[in-house]
From Swiss-Prot:
Quaternary structure (record): Probable peripherally associated component of the endosomal sorting required for transport complex III (ESCRT-III).
Assigned keywords, A-Z: Coiled coil, Cytoplasm, Endosome, Membrane, Protein transport, Transport
Residue intervals passing through the bilayer: none
Organism classification: Eukaryota, Metazoa, Chordata, Craniata, Vertebrata
UniProt membrane topology term: Peripheral membrane protein
Name under which the protein is recorded: Charged multivesicular body protein 1b
Alphabetized PANTHER family for the sequence: CHARGED MULTIVESICULAR BODY PROTEIN
Motif MIT-interacting motif per UniProt: ranges: 186-196
Length: 199
């Protein structure tokens, strides 16, 4: 196994680890929700509010870990393509060497900065075989068409007998807390869309 393949393995491992962290935060969110119910039943609204804040924080953290997992996974796919095509540049190899400690830290800010460096390397990467790139992007596209995502979400909601309410205008989501959370999510979604456009 070459050094580059080891680093590629570490990238894929980090994506899985981030995904595990996301699931852990999901569990924490559920635990906090259970505590909210207990506190409300006891009439202790102050404690309930603290658990509600914790639940929202865990939910946002779960989403952040999941987004970063997807981003690292996408970069791993790009590195795999570069390795396969023999197009790993010296500067890209340098970025890859510096990543091991960053990925182990599970620090989202540091990992995000590292992914920025990777994405910059791919922007400057001169792809020799455009036809191969086109073929690969058709089979393993990194950017998912939004309408397909929406259709799948709707399909899953229909199967579960739920109403997605995707057409609801912002601000009609109910309480102030949820509209703030949705505003944060909208901002994250916009940032992710901008990142996709850069890739």
């Amino acid at each position: 196994m070459s050094n580059m393949e080891k680093h590629l393995f570490n990238l894929k491992f980090a994506a899985k680890e981030l995904n595990r962290n996301s699931k852990r935060c999901d569990k924490e969110e559920k635990a906090e929700k259970a505590k909210i119910k207990k506190a409300i039943q006891k009439g202790n609204m102050e404690v309930a509010r603290i658990h509600a804040e914790n639940a929202i924080r865990q939910k946002n953290q779960a989403i952040n870990f999941l987004r970063m997992s997807a981003r690292v996974d996408a970069v791993a796919a790009r590195v795999q393509t570069a390795v396969t095509m023999g197009k790993v540049t010296k500067s890209m190899a340098g970025v890859v060497k510096s990543m091991d400690a960053t990925l182990k830290s599970m620090n989202l800010e540091k990992i995000s900065a590292l992914m920025d460096k990777f994405e910059h390397q791919f922007e400057t990467l001169d792809v020799q075989t455009q036809q191969m790139e086109n073929t690969m992007s058709n089979t393993t596209t990194l950017t998912t068409p939004q309408n397909q995502v929406d259709m799948l979400l709707q399909e899953m909601a229909d199967e579960a007998g739920l109403d997605l309410n995707m057409e609801l205008p912002q601000g009609q989501t109910g309480s102030v807390g949820t509209s703030v959370a949705s505003a944060e999510q909208d901002e994250l979604s916009q940032r992710l869309a901008r990142l996709r456009d850069q890739v």
